[in-house]
Curated annotation (Swiss-Prot):
SUPFAM superfamilies: Ribonuclease H-like. Plays a role in intracellular enveloped virus (IEV) transport to the cell surface through microtubule transport. Together with protein OPG064, forms a complex that interacts with host KLC2 (kinesin light chain isoform 2) to engage the kinesin-1 complex and thereby promote IEV trafficking. This is Protein OPG056. The keyword Ribosomal protein does not apply. It comes from Variola virus (isolate Human/India/Ind3/1967). It is found in: Virion membrane; Host endosome. Interacts with protein OPG164. Interacts with protein OPG064.
Length: 635
């Protein structure tokens, strides 16, 4: 089986081979090394990220393991509380999702009954979901005639003499709990079908859930330390045996990984006496060091590890940066060379444990020398980029593209006086993320040629992006940028699926779409009903001029970095869900998808096999490569 995976990795440059590789990754984690000997753990959740950063056909596959199970169990995705909007019908009133729907109903009745309104104004009513407690309060205020009665009890003739009573239909709704509907007209009432929605858009639009990008850029830190984790191969999978730091100590333990990690954390704690935040800088640490430690992270150690952040029980924070994501694809030695430090080799990862023990003294020395070189290169690069991309600082970002684009957007915002905002809590972020679709939409599995947008940068730099805080609207306004919760119905005739949905048997579903995607889907014949939207009244104008100025500045500093950065920006939008320019990525991806669809409109649908926001697979027999296709490149 190892031989089979090794062959697949060497030829993983087409969709079919990569899909076969994914099948293995459902059962195994691939242990691989690059040319410099740096370990890479490849699993189902990170293969796409790895392929966006490097050519995986050049990696050496060392082995397979089933032991790193923590990496195969994805962390739970935060879920917003399901939401039902308020419905005020002539026959009934259904309050929006609330912990106390009965209180909402009595307040609604007070709009029509002045004596209830007066009682609510004079006397407070405690929040409660108990009908008997509400009735007790009404009775104590001389308002017993408005007592709450359940619909089923009323139909049993028990309360017919109370003509003014508040009749409520009681129900339990999954993932929401108890809900009540006030029945205004018994003659015309039938229990309504209420849309249970994944988001409360009105809540998400609240001002306090949005912050200006510029306000998050002015951050400082005290200390930077380079770090590397080394792993050996054992019968139970890869095992960390050494953690090296510079400036700092080297920790070695072949007998207990728990003790190795605890000693490292104790040292971190000791050096944080004068600061609450330090920066650890690794190289390819997101691909090996951090996931390997995550597998062995001890319970109840006083620290939690969340992706690239360590947080202690007393609030101290360690940001673990991966300098590789700022290298534009350079090897460690090339990165050090291009940023002015002496390139040094490092110990190989994923060697046998017995070999690591035998050579440990030389490994410790070699690791320290390599980390010193990385430290000097990183300090030089961070100083240079923080001048060119002020006020952006490297440690605030997870990769160079994110830092570069944020600096461009911030500069345009300053010049125009219109700033971009970003969501500050999990639910509002999740709503924005839900509008981003990076998946391939499969039409058929015929043999195809792959085409990619020639320059993503050209497309996205000439478009407009949201400025300011969003407003809640029931339906978006044509010509304005907005993101809406939508009920989507697919066309009944044969069609190319434009809106991604993972259930082929469902013809109507609820999803989040940008105004750009709504326009594209409508052109494709979809029926879309908007169920609430975040809308922006102002736009940041096109970024092209500022983008070109920024590229020129970096080019003057380092041509290799600039050329590689430009290539990455042209080929990809590497979406990052923790980015403060999340809104930019959302609309940039939608603009690219609209462009892909405009090309698909010129091609007979029988020739289209699959597509994503930046790529299009066309049947090999298709020969009519028109002028529009000149904006794509064949891979």
């Amino acid at each position: 089986m190892l031989n089979r995976v090794q062959i697949l990795m060497k030829t993983a440059n087409n969709y079919e081979t990569i899909e076969i590789l994914r099948n293995y990754l459902r059962l195994y984690i691939i242990l691989a090394r690059n040319e410099e000997g740096h370990g890479i753990l490849i699993y189902d959740d990170n293969i796409d990220s790895i392929m966006s950063m490097m050519n995986i056909t050049r990696l050496e596959v060392i082995g397979l393991t089933t032991h790193c199970t923590k990496l195969r169990s994805s962390p739970p995705i935060p879920m917003s509380r399901l939401f039902m909007d308020e419905i005020d019908h002539e026959s009934y009133y259904s309050p929006k999702t609330s912990d106390y729907p009965l209180i909402d109903i009595i307040r609604k009745r007070s709009h029509e009954q002045g004596d209830i309104a007066l009682a609510l104004k004079r006397y407070c009513i405690e929040n409660t979901d108990s009908i008997s407690e509400i009735n007790e309060w009404l009775s104590s205020k001389g308002l017993a005639c408005y007592r709450f009665v359940k619909f089923n009890d009323y139909r049993k003739q028990m309360y017919r003499k109370f003509s003014k009573c508040t009749i409520v239909d009681s129900m339990i709704i999954g993932h929401i709990g108890h809900h009540y509907i006030w029945i205004k007209n018994l003659e015309t009432y039938t229990r309504p079908e209420i849309d249970v929605l994944p988001f409360d858009i009105k809540y998400i639009s609240r001002d306090e859930l949005w912050a200006q990008i510029s306000s998050s850029l002015d951050q400082t830190h005290i200390k930077t330390i380079t770090v590397s984790v080394y792993g050996a191969i054992t019968d139970n999978g890869p095992m960390p045996y050494m953690i090296s730091t510079y400036p700092g100590n080297t920790f070695v333990n072949f007998n207990s990984v728990k003790d190795l990690i605890l000693n490292f954390l104790d040292w971190i704690k000791d050096i944080m006496t004068s600061t609450r935040t330090i920066i650890l800088v690794g190289y390819m640490s997101n691909l090996f060091d951090i996931p390997l430690l995550t597998v062995y992270w001890p319970n109840n150690c006083g620290w939690k590890i969340y992706n690239n952040i360590l947080i202690s029980s007393d609030g101290a924070r360690v940001i673990w940066m991966d300098a590789y994501k700022f290298s534009c694809g350079l090897s460690l030695q090339d990165y050090c060379y291009h940023w002015g430090s002496k390139p040094e080799s490092r110990p190989f990862d994923l060697i046998k444990k017995i070999d690591a023990k035998r050579n440990i003294k030389s490994w410790v020395k070699e690791s320290m020398t390599s980390l010193k070189s990385l430290y000097e290169a990183f300090e030089t690069q961070s100083g240079a980029l923080e001048v060119l991309m002020s006020p952006c600082r490297m440690f605030s970002f997870s990769r160079i593209e994110d830092m570069f684009l944020t600096s461009v957007i911030n500069r345009v915002s300053k010049n125009t006086g219109m700033g971009m905002y970003y969501p500050t809590n999990d639910i509002s972020s999740l709503f924005i993320e839900s509008s981003i679709c990076l998946d391939y939409i499969i039409v058929n599995n015929q043999k195809s040629n792959k085409y990619r947008i020639k320059s993503v940068l050209d497309i996205i730099s000439s478009k407009q992006y949201p400025a300011g805080r969003p407003n809640y609207v029931k339906n978006g306004t044509k010509g304005k940028l907005y993101i809406a919760l939508c009920k989507v119905t697919v066309p009944t005739n044969d069609h190319i699926p434009v809106v991604y949905h993972d259930d082929d048997n469902t013809t109507t579903f609820i999803t989040v779409l940008t105004s750009v995607d709504i326009e594209t889907a409508t052109r494709a014949g979809y029926s879309i009903v908007e169920l609430g939207a975040l809308q922006w009244d102002d736009n940041i104008p096109e970024l092209k001029d500022c983008l070109l100025d920024s590229i020129k500045m970096i080019y003057d500093l380092n041509t290799v970095t600039t050329n590689n950065l430009l290539e990455q920006l042209i080929e990809n939008i590497n979406f990052n869900n923790s980015s403060i320019i999340l809104l930019f990525y959302t609309f940039a991806i939608s603009y690219c998808r609209a462009f892909i669809y405009s090309i698909m409109e010129t091609i007979d649908p029988v020739y289209i096999s699959q597509f994503s926001y930046k790529e299009l697979y066309i049947r090999s027999s298709y020969k009519d490569i028109n002028e529009v296709m000149s904006q794509m490149v064949k891979l």
